């Protein structure tokens, strides 16, 4: 969904949603976004958070996977500024969410943390000294590409055995549907978690989540990890992740807090981007859109 709203200096008004239709490609997506923005009036800046790896220097899409065909290289900032004649800023959606959590969510008071979101895939962000670490090619935090099951890499699919394939909500659904094809989303799955065969699949999925998090703890030694995505609202998931990670990490790594995102679900997905972008653009009369 494309979620948009107008920041009036205190809150968001005129909240709207429209289908992304990502499979139609990047050019079609830009036309949908422009049409949505044209439905607003009297704004002085535009902020966009989007899937894909964003070159924050020029506001273009450095890389996007096949979920949005033709999106790689898209000059989003340039397109918006030329269309609307106002300044624009573009940021990766998870990075924007992490900065929103830093300012007004569960990252408050912690300048160094990791933020991961679990949904269709797994997105990640690294916050160091109060800023997102972009990496050499704006791709730092691509945790979904970590290989956690090398034994599954047999073909040309780059995601075989990777964290994103195994630990995402999509990965959970894929597992469970092999047992019961009617359980095709997270809500249905957790409504059936008392069934032993379903709980077994959920626990195996949580094990994969924890394998990735323990690896990240060894690399970054964070004091806090923030987990977002609708599936993390399940109390059982967060409780088990905390228990298993703390049991597996080396004592020398200290204690890591694993906490749910405060802002990164539903309207908060857009809000986290907005909270950051208001520091870079105008504080009032700014229009924001989250392209999910």
PLM segments and residue spans:
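ATP-binding/phosphotransfer module of carbohydrate and carboxylate kinases, centering on a glycine-rich
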Residues: 1-47, 55-60, 80-88, 100-111, ...
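Short clusters of small/polar residues that mark proteolytic maturation junctions
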Residues: 17-19, 66, 137
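A short acidic/small-residue loop/turn micro-motif
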Residues: 20-22, 69, 140-142
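Conserved NAD(P)H cofactor-binding loop of Rossmann-fold oxidoreductase domains
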Residues: 51
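A charged helix-plus-loop insertion that forms the helical arch/lid used to bind
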Residues: 60-73
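Short loop/edge segments at beta-strand edges and connector loops
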Residues: 90-94
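Glycine-rich phosphate-binding loop of actin/hexokinase-like ATP-binding domains
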Residues: 108-162
């Amino acid at each position: 969904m494309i979620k948009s709203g107008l920041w009036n200096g205190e809150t968001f008004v005129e909240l709207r949603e429209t289908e992304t239709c990502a499979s139609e490609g990047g050019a079609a997506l830009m036309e949908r976004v422009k049409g949505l923005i044209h439905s607003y009036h009297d704004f002085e800046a535009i902020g966009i958070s989007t899937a894909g790896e964003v070159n924050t220097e020029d506001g273009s899409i450095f890389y996007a996977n096949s979920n949005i065909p033709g999106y790689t290289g898209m000059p989003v900032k340039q397109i918006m500024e030329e269309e609307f004649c106002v300044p624009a800023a573009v940021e990766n959606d998870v990075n924007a969410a992490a900065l929103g959590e830093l300012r007004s969510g569960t990252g408050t008071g912690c300048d160094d943390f990791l933020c991961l979101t679990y949904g269709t895939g797994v997105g990640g962000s690294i916050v160091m000294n109060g800023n997102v670490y972009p990496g050499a090619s704006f791709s730092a935090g691509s945790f979904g590409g970590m290989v956690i099951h090398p034994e599954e890499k047999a073909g040309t699919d780059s995601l075989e055995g990777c964290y994103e394939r195994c630990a995402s909500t999509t990965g959970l659904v894929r597992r469970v549907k092999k047992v019961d094809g009617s359980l095709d989303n997270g809500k249905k799955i957790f409504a059936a978690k008392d069934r032993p065969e379903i709980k077994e699949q959920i626990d195996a999925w949580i094990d994969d989540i924890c394998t990735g998090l323990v690896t990240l703890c060894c690399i970054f030694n964070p004091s806090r990890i923030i987990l977002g995505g609708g599936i993390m609202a399940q109390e059982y998931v967060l409780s088990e992740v905390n228990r298993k990670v703390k049991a597996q990490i080396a004592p020398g790594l200290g204690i890591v807090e694993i906490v749910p995102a405060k802002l990164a679900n539903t309207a908060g997905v857009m809000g986290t981007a907005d909270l950051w972008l208001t520091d870079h653009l105008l504080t009032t009369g700014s229009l924001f859109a989250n392209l999910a």
